[in-house]
Amino acid sequence: MDNFRVIYRILRYIERSMDCEEFDEEHFTAACFGVTETRFFYLLAALVADGYVVGIRCEEVASGRYVVLISPQLTLAGMEYLAENTMMKKAYRLAKGIKDITPGA
């Protein structure tokens, strides 16, 4: 699966969870996003390091890799990423729709 698609889904999941009292950790797993544990760890670590999310700690120690969830939330940068990518998807669908109905295109 494309990394950026997984990143979008992770951010979207966190954004939707901001309306809930408690974060649903049960469905916030590598398996739920269709990636390996290793890829999930590194994608989350990148999102934290680049300032898209807070409330997640990614720890790599001798005994393994651990993701610690402490009330995950999007930062403004994370919200902007979601907004920009949502607009890009809409523009893509619009352009594709125009192409589909345009003869000879």
Predicted segment positions?
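Short amphipathic alpha-helical interface segments
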Residues: 3-32
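Alpha-helix N-cap/helix-initiation sites
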Residues: 3-4, 20-22, 37, 88, ...
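Generic structural signal for hydrophobic core residues of well-folded globular domains
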Residues: 11-17, 47, 82-85
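Short, surface-exposed loop/turn segments at secondary-structure junctions
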Residues: 25-26, 30, 59-65
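Short amphipathic alpha-helical interaction segments
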Residues: 33-56, 69
